[in-house]
Amino acid sequence: MAVDTSAPSGRLQQTNPDYDPNIVVEAQNLTKIYRDFWGRPKVRALNALDLEIRKGEIFGLLGPNGSGKSTTIKLLLGLLFPTSGRALVLGQNATEVTKNERIGYLPEESYLYKFLTAEETLDFYGRLFDMPAKVRKERVSQLIEQVRLTWAKRRQLKEYSKGMTRRIGLAQALINDPELILLDEPTSGLDPLGTREMKDMILKLRDEGKTVVMCSHLLADVQDVCDRIAILYQGDLKELGRVDSLLKVGDETQVRASKLSPEAEAEIRDVIARHGGEVKSIENPRTNLEDLFLNIVRESQERPGHRSAGADSNSAS
């Protein structure tokens, strides 16, 4: 095993000798079966999941309730142990607790102590990471400004709206300046303005070189910010690839042009040039993520165990 000293606390961490720093998360035949009281298989929550999440991308996990999204997140955090297969996170086995020093996590519900202020809440989490007082103070101030809660930083969280609580929850997930951020329904409870601001913050994290994995039922949000997505259904991976590639309608071509006479429109490229027209773009038209998602779910219901023909686990980032 190699030794990694890049953790915030400076502790030594063991990493896989074959670790590729450009692969932040790797699931290999990852399976989770929940058993009943007698140890008998009850629910196959995740079935032989194989995927890679690359450094610096925003990756979306999509699926209806019971599809295995939350189970996947808990396996990556080490809160659950796989029945078979394995997950590597930042070069370490996901069951290694030390890797969590380099991870930020925003759960679907932010369980924060309601009688603390925003400043006190973030200071508490900074202490958990053994951050020095001066560094902690600067980091708390920076994060409160980043999530736009400076005006409410000394109010107790019990006075916060759901949207404000989500923002301070995001700040809590970022307190340790993590390399990997896991977000479960990050825009839940936010109004349209708050949703836009949250998406802008997620995009900024990518610009800073961080890797973001987000679960969401709000498909428009995923379409807006994610580079690649995985669609799960009843524990099976149904689709994997870049959002822009998955949404292309492959058997159609769309041409957008300006300054064209009616005659020029009929003959496309040659006539466009001959008549002085300007081609704006020639590309495959796209569906939207909601239609793609619903089509995959319907196909999965009609053909259990089938994975969509267009799935591409090797899409370039």
Q: Where are the regions that the model predicts?
A:
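Conserved acidic
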Residues: 19, 214, 285
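ABC transporter nucleotide-binding domains
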Residues: 22-27, 32-227, 231-233, 239
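ABC-family P-loop ATPase nucleotide-binding domain
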Residues: 1-40, 300-317
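Generic marker of residues within folded, mature protein domains
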Residues: 17-20, 116, 245-247, 272
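Hydrophobic alpha-helical segments with strong N-terminal bias
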Residues: 13-16, 75, 199, 232, ...
